[in-house]
């Protein structure tokens, strides 16, 4: 079929949420002529739900995005109103940064970045059709019948695909925040042969700040100690006049109001058909599932420095408006609250992610990539991480270069993508530290050491940043070597100083590195005894040193496990293997293999329902095929 294309691009990204922004910036920065099409230019990088970035596991993802050369970390470091390190009382594997964002400023600043980016065209357009010829993407068609050619297309439509907002008994076609839904494109994806699922998510009401009695709530301030998402941000730029959040709770009256109106709740009346998020349930769902709990936490989160809107985190609901007002006013501090926006639920179509490769390219159509909530995930950070990987791989495909696959041992982004393409998801997928078996080596403090080299090799990390990274890496390695070479002896003067600090005296000579393995001994304490490095160390290097030294034994065990799994990951499975040709594997395993088509032995081993015996048989089969080829040659 001959198309009359209005314009030609290397890559077209459909949707300008958090996934679309990262995908388009990555592709254009890698030298590809890129079009970013969105239904509404005013909603670029918009936050339709919580006004925050980061949190448990998610904060590590933002650091990973930054280390690879993505934008989210830099953007939130310019636009936050509060910064807080979570889980500081726990081990380093689960620590993560979280920022309250100035919602409007975040979107505005990201839009400016996109508008200034070379090779990137931003256009308001509804994409209705992905144009495909001979199983390959060739372009897109808009609702106004304009056609644009592309060698790769990335779909990042968020919750807009056949979106429907639900509020009480009201249900109507809409994307998030009453934007347009993308219905024709949803039909087109089905017609192209993609399996489609249906998910649901929700958002809480927003209340007017001046109507809140904060004296009845508990203040939740940010951190005084500087912290940043981007490895390029400087401590001297840390914002000190931060805006606090506030803590309050539901109570028995709140629960009574909900219970008395469950018949009007779409969650229970049968109006909601989509599957909702397990880890972010609606308040009505929480009251029913945890009926024994007398109260639930609610955080009052300002949506910006210059707005009255306050997000009531923990009160996601699709109850009717009148019930929402009564519910809000039953809560301590909100007795006179003015509701500025109602909470609502939204149902939307997703592309079932078992149809994707680890590059986020669909197996059905060459050159078609999907990312973000389109793939069944929840959260801005999960979306941005996928968008970055999809954009990178779309560009690499266009350029004829080797693809980028992040392994589970490389990044939380790799864990997420592997979970999606290997196991699929039956509900909106959220990243958790418990999903990562190698979480001790996937920490927030070492994201640059893990990923910046990759970002540099693919062209997303520039020379200036790479030089800063290499200097930090050299500082770390040199200081580690120095600490391992200096001996502390159990002489009386040394032990006296150690005891004065409240620590146990030495009984044997040990290196400064061994001394730092003691739980109470920080780098600052150790250098009191052995002196400092020749040049002052970056605070990020000091944090990395302390973690790597104190957890060295555990880290080594994790790296040994990674090495074993690497051997499995290196055993590739041919793309067009006939699974019926393999004798003796269990029926369930055969069915799963046919559905998912794993690309490596390692991926095959992680499919639920596949047991070690099936993997052993598959390994023997693959080795037999390889020997057969050698004999033929």
UniProtKB/Swiss-Prot annotation:
Keywords: Cytoplasm, FAD, Flavoprotein, NAD, tRNA processing. It comes from the Bacteria. GO terms for biological process: tRNA methylation; tRNA wobble uridine modification. InterPro entries: FAD/NAD-bd_sf, GIDA_C_N, MnmG, MnmG-rel, MnmG-rel_CS, MnmG_C, MnmG_C_subdom, MnmG_C_subdom_sf. Its cofactor is FAD. FAD binds at residues 15-20, 127, 182, 373. The keyword Lyase does not apply. GO terms for cellular component: cytosol. It holds the Pfam family GIDA_C_1st. It is found in: Cytoplasm. NAD(+) binds at residues 276-290. GO terms for molecular function: flavin adenine dinucleotide binding. Belongs to the MnmG family. HAMAP family: MnmG_GidA. Homodimer. Heterotetramer of two MnmE and two MnmG subunits. This is tRNA uridine 5-carboxymethylaminomethyl modification enzyme MnmG.
């Amino acid at each position: 079929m001959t198309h009359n294309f209005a314009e030609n691009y290397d890559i077209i990204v459909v949707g300008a949420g958090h996934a679309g922004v990262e995908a388009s910036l990555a592709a254009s920065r890698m030298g590809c002529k890129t079009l970013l099409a969105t239904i509404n230019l005013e909603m670029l990088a918009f936050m339709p739900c919580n006004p925050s970035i980061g949190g448990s596991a998610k904060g590590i993802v933002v650091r990973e995005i930054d280390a690879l050369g993505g934008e989210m970390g830099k953007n939130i470091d310019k636009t936050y109103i509060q910064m807080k390190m979570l889980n500081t009382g726990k081990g380093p594997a689960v620590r993560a940064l979280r920022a309250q964002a100035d919602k409007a400023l975040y979107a505005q600043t990201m839009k400016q970045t996109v508008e200034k980016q070379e090779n990137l065209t931003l256009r308001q357009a509804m994409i209705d059709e992905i144009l495909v010829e001979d199983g390959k993407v060739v372009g897109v068609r808009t609702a106004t019948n304009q056609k644009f050619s592309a060698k790769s297309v990335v779909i990042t439509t968020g919750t807009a695909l056949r979106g429907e907002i639900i509020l009480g008994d009201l249900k109507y076609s809409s994307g998030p925040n009453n934007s347009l839904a993308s219905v024709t494109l949803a039909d087109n994806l089905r017609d192209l042969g993609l399996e489609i699922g249906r998910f649901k998510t929700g958002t809480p009401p927003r209340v007017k700040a001046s109507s809140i009695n904060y004296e009845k709530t508990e203040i939740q301030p940010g951190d005084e100690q500087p912290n940043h998402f981007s490895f390029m941000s400087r401590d001297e730029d840390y914002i000190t006049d931060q805006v606090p959040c506030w803590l309050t709770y539901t109570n028995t009256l709140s629960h009574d109001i909900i219970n008395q109106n469950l018949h009007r709740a779409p969650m229970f009346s049968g109006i909601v058909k989509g599957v909702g998020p397990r880890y972010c349930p609606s308040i009505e769902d929480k009251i029913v599932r945890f009926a024994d709990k007398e109260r639930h936490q609610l955080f009052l989160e300002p949506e910006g420095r210059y707005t009255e809107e306050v997000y009531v985190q923990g009160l996601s609901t699709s109850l009717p408006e009148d019930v929402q007002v009564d519910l809000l006013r039953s809560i301590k501090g909100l007795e006179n609250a003015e509701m500025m926006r109602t909470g609502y639920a939204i149902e939307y179509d997703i592309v079932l992610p078992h149809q994707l490769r680890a590059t986020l390219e669909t197996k059905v159509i060459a050159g078609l990539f999907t990312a973000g909530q389109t793939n069944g995930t929840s959260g801005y950070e999960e979306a941005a991480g996928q968008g970055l990987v999809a954009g990178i791989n779309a560009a690499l495909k266009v350029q004829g270069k080797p693809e980028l696959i992040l392994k589970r041992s490389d990044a939380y982004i790799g864990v997420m993508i592997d979970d999606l393409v290997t196991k699929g998801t039956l509900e909106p997928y959220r990243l958790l530290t418990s999903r990562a078996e190698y979480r001790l080596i996937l920490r927030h403090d070492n994201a640059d050491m893990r990923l910046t080299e990759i970002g540099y090799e693919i062209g997303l990390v520039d020379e200036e940043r790479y030089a800063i990274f290499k200097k930090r890496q050299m500082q770390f390695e040199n200081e580690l070597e120095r600490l391992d070479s200096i001996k502390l002896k159990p002489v009386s003067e040394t032990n006296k100083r150690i005891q004065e600090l409240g620590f146990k005296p030495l009984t044997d000579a040990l290196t400064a590195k061994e001394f730092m393995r003691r739980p109470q001994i920080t780098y600052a304490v150790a250098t009191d005894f052995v002196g400092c490095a020749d040049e002052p160390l970056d605070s990020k290097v000091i944090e990395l040193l302390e973690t790597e030294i104190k957890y060295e034994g555990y880290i080594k065990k994790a790296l040994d496990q990674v090495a074993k799994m690497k051997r499995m990951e290196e055993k590739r499975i041919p793309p067009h293997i006939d699974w019926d040709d393999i004798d003796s594997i269990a029926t369930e395993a055969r069915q799963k293999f046919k559905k998912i088509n794993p690309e490596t032995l390692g991926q095959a081993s992680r499919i639920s329902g596949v047991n070690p015996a099936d993997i052993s048989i598959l390994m023997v089969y693959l080795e037999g095929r390889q020997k057969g080829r050698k004999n033929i040659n």
